[in-house]
């Protein structure tokens, strides 16, 4: 009998819904606060350095800088404040924002600053003359204001020309300077004000990590759209001003760092003094309205019973059974609890009898470490006895770890047979480790085996180091493809002739200058190379993505001495930062590289390392692919010192500077009829 279940009516708490709604739409509330404060920025005073006040402060400072160029700044403020022409006021604020950024960009050039002040004086004179009335030349186009609008367009063109002449044609320097010189310092001042502390220089340099990554990617996508629009349609005061205004919203993208700080770590709040006079209600404080509920989900008490069979559709976790047949050494049903990994060794049959007409290679079970990193060793490999450890580590002796029986007439082309010989060594060695959490492969001590050369019934013994991890990766039936790829790419395979290791280029350590002993991970950068379809997309940033590939390719191998690795990591992080804001700032700094000799020396050092990279040819092919499919070399040359040095290191002859020869995709006939969208390429019909 099924009893009826009645849903309990929701409990309504006064003020709770409002509180939750306010917290859920905090960003929207901040944006609306910015709009409200922007309308009263001339008459009211902003109190306290709050994050949401920054856009209004920038607008106020821009208007003040422009109005100072006029004969009567107070009259200009009055005209602007009392005007009801919304479009006209917006046009003036856009001009003022670009004008103030131009003043900062031309601070080193007295001549450019004089020209700017002249343009500002003429513009403010037009404001006084126009009056910002209903029919204004600053608003929508009207036939009767055609002459005045022509003068304004001429002044806007002069402003853009002055900026281009003093930034090398790169208007993006304005937004970069705004972020590094004003946005980030303002964020630091807000933190210092709210927490009553002083930030050290290292903390200030890491403030960019406070910005939410997803929100930062949205800003980067908008920045790329702005660059493409500028390339296609040219520059305009409105477009550049709106781009600068977008940068002022960065403080609103901060994580809610204040709410995550424990209450006992916050400074004592300032309690206002009570007003003079009688206190109502006998001096009792009024209870606050509304209810604040903090919900904390504690998952520490959750227990997982691995003794039951759990089917996650992609993994099998069964720790209750370990079937081991000691009679024929069959490891076909070893199930290791590795949270998401099921290892099937059914293909590994280490029977004691082998056919002479077939080749059978048997390896001991790999050591698999889970998050506990607890291990146990095997007592006897010959009988197949296994101790049930928490992490499932299995150690075997050297004579049982690698066994290969090969028919010389059918399998061995060079006349060599690899066999295991008892008594070669009695030392216990572990083959390899697979960390189920990080998908990282660690090579244990190599096994010493004996290689017998078969030549006219003469045997010649050689000692070879054999570590074969590729069969292991191919037999991980339940391991995800990503983990398998990582295992095969990051593992160093050691053979008798040292092929396929970082030692295959012995001259590498001799040609890296001060970084003696520097070695790189092999093929680790291949995972960062995007697909051709992605390269053709609208929002693809060819420069940053390519430099990211180079940064990954220059990742030192763990065999590099620690002092050398630490020093090179510092150089790599400085020249190839994993931060778009820092990368743009470095690009702007390198535009006048002669004023920074230390930076130039570091660039030359990194270029020398790239020149002698063991996989330089592969990286050069990737560079040409970026140039061909994504137009990388359109960002080339003297305007981008960092990118040009990297390309010169990879392509020594400098042929990439020719440009169109490599940009075949962008120069195909009819490419102007191709529309590039997020989902691919489409032909115009």
Swiss-Prot record:
The keyword Cell cycle does not apply. Residues 338-349, 369-383, 494-511 have a biased composition (Polar residues). Residues 497-669 are annotated as: Actin-binding and polymerization. Residues 265-386, 404-432, 494-514 are annotated as: Disordered. Pfam families: SipA (PF09052), SipA_2nd (PF22163). Keywords: Actin-binding, Secreted, Virulence. Residues 315-337 have a biased composition (Basic and acidic residues). It is found in: Secreted. Residues 291-304, 417-429 have a biased composition (Low complexity). One of its GO terms (molecular function) is actin binding. It comes from the Bacteria. Its main location: secreted. Gene3D superfamilies: Salmonella invasion protein A, C-terminal actin-binding domain, SipA N-terminal domain-like. One of its GO terms (cellular component) is extracellular region. Belongs to the SipA/IpaA family. Actin-binding protein that interferes with host cell actin cytoskeleton. It stimulates actin polymerization and counteracts F-actin destabilizing proteins. Potentiates SipC activity; both are required for an efficient bacterial internalization. This is Cell invasion protein SipA. The lineage of its organism: Bacteria, Pseudomonadati, Pseudomonadota, Gammaproteobacteria, Enterobacterales. The gene is sipA.
């Amino acid at each position: 009998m099924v009893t009826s279940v009645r849903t309990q009516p929701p409990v309504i708490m006064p003020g709770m819904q409002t509180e939750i709604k306010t917290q859920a739409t905090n960003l929207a509330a901040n944006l609306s606060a910015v709009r409200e404060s922007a309308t009263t920025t001339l008459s009211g005073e902003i109190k306290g350095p709050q994050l949401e006040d920054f856009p209004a402060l920038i607008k106020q400072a821009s208007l003040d800088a422009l109005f100072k160029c006029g004969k009567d700044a107070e009259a200009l403020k009055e005209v602007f404040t009392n005007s009801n022409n919304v479009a006209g006021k917006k046009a003036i604020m856009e001009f003022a924002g670009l004008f103030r950024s131009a003043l900062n960009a031309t601070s080193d050039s007295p001549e450019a600053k004089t020209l700017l002040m002249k343009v500002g004086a003429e513009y403010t004179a037009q404001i006084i003359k126009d009056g910002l009335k209903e029919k204004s030349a600053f608003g929508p186009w009207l036939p009767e204001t055609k002459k005045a609008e022509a003068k304004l367009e001429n002044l806007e063109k002069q402003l853009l020309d002055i900026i281009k002449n003093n930034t090398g044609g790169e208007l993006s320097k304005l937004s970069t300077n705004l972020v590094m010189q004003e946005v980030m310092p303002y964020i630091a001042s807000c933190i210092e004000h709210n927490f009553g502390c002083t930030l050290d220089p290292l903390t200030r340099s890491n403030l960019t990590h406070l910005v939410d990554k997803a929100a930062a990617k949205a800003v980067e996508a908008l920045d790329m759209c702005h660059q493409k629009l500028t390339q296609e349609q040219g520059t305009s005061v409105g477009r550049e001003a709106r781009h600068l205004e977008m940068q002022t919203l960065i403080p609103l993208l901060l994580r809610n760092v204040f709410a995550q700080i424990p209450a006992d770590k916050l400074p004592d709040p300032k309690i206002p003094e009570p007003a003079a006079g009688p206190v109502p209600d006998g001096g009792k404080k009024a209870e606050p309205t509304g209810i604040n509920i903090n919900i904390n989900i504690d998952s520490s008490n959750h227990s997982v019973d691995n003794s039951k069979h759990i089917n996650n559709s992609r993994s099998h976790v069964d720790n209750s059974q370990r079937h081991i047949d000691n009679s024929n050494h069959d490891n076909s049903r070893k199930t290791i609890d590795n949270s998401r990994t099921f290892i099937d060794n059914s293909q590994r049959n280490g029977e004691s009898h082998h056919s002479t007409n077939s080749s059978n290679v048997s390896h001991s079970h790999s050591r698999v470490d889970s998050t506990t990193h607890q291990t146990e060793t095997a007592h006897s490999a010959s009988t197949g006895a296994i101790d049930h450890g928490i992490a499932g580590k299995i150690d075997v002796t050297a004579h049982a770890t690698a066994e290969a029986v090969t028919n010389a007439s059918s399998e061995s082309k060079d006349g060599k047979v690899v066999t295991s010989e008892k008594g070669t060594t009695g030392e216990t060695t572990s083959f390899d480790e697979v960390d189920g959490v990080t998908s990282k492969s660690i090579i244990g001590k190599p096994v010493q085996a004996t290689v017998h050369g078969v030549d006219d019934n003469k045997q010649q013994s050689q000692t070879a180091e054999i570590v074969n991890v590729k069969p292991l990766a191919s037999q991980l039936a339940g391991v995800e493809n990503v983990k398998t790829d990582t295992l095969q790419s990051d593992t160093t395979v050691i053979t008798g002739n040292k092929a396929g290791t970082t030692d295959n280029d012995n001259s590498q350590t001799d040609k890296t200058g001060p970084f003696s002993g520097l070695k790189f991970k092999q093929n680790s950068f291949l995972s960062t190379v995007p697909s051709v379809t992605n390269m053709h997309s609208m929002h693809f940033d060819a420069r940053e993505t390519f430099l990211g590939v180079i940064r990954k390719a220059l990742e030192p191998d763990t065999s590099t001495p620690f002092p050398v690795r630490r020093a090179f990591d510092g150089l790599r992080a400085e020249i190839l930062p994993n931060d778009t804001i820092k990368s743009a700032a470095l690009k702007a700094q390198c535009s006048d590289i002669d004023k920074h000799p230390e930076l130039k020396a570091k660039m030359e050092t990194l270029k020398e390392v790239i020149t002698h990279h063991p996989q330089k040819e592969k990286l050069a092919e990737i560079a040409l692919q970026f140039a061909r499919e994504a137009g990388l070399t359109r960002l080339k040359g003297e305007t981008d010192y960092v990118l040009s040095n990297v390309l010169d290191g990879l392509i020594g002859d400098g042929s990439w500077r020719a440009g169109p020869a490599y940009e075949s995709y962008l120069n195909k006939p009819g490419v102007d009829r191709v529309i590039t969208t997020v989902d691919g390429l489409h032909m115009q019909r």
